[in-house]
Design a protein with these regions (language model features):
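Short, basic, low-complexity termini and linkers enriched in Ser/Thr/Gly/Pro
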Residues: 1-5, 10-36, 193-195
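RNase III-family endoribonuclease catalytic core
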Residues: 34-146, 155-156
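Short active-site-adjacent structural elements
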Residues: 142-143, 172-176
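Generic structural marker for isolated residues within well-ordered, non-membrane alpha-helices
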Residues: 149
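Pyridoxal 5′-phosphate
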Residues: 165-169
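C-terminal edge-of-domain segments
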Residues: 176-195
């Protein structure tokens, strides 16, 4: 059904040409969604324990506790890896870097991020941007965020302006709020680098 708009004038209203094409194929082609953009979401959480190193976004943060994990336990990078892998439908971090493998024991999560970047390139995707949030009661992360952005951007081969990192507390409510855990959530946008 063709929709018409009416022109308001002092005279009698007259029909305007429809902005909608008459051919259904032409109309549908204007709204065809190509798989050129993909969105992924990732999250990670680690219990904190005394005597462990706290590393977030590839940055060592002085603190008396750190994550209990097979690798370095960088929850921020783990969430970003999952978001990127999910956007490209390439599985998850556990599939690519299993905690049952000695190869990844105490490994730097920046290595994971570089490998994920390579996988994305092989699959025909480029990273448009990453947006992440870290939940940690203390220490305050604001002073470390610019360094995190630079390290993450370097590992991903993008500009720091394409990486957003935010920090939140748990307001004393859950395991994060009680200072017992660190949590990270991330969203990533990919673009197809080839048709």
């Amino acid at each position: 059904m063709k929709q018409l708009a009416l022109r308001r004038t002092a005279r009698q209203p007259s029909p305007l040409k429809s902005a909608r094409p008459t051919s259904r194929a032409i109309y549908n082609s204007q709204f065809t969604i190509h798989n050129s953009c993909r969105v992924g979401r990732g999250n990670d959480v680690h219990r904190l324990a005394p005597g462990r190193r706290l590393i977030l976004g590839g940055v060592r943060i002085p603190f008396e506790k750190g994550p209990v994990a097979h690798s370095d336990g960088d929850a921020l990078i783990h969430a970003i890896c999952d978001a990127l892998l999910g956007a490209a439908a390439l599985g998850d971090i556990g599939h690519h870097f299993p905690d049952t493998s000695l190869q990844w024991r105490n490994a730097s999560s920046l290595l994971f991020l570089r490998r994920v970047r390579r996988l994305l390139g092989q699959a025909g995707y480029t990273i448009v941007n990453v947006d992440a949030t870290v939940g940690l009661e203390r220490p305050k992360l604001a002073p470390y965020i610019p360094r995190m952005q630079k390290k993450l951007a370097a590992a991903l081969g993008i500009r720091p302006a394409q990486v957003s990192v935010k920090a939140k507390t748990g307001e004393g409510l859950d395991a994060v709020g009680q200072g017992e855990a660190v949590r990270a959530d991330a969203v990533a946008l990919l673009a197809a680098s080839r048709p």
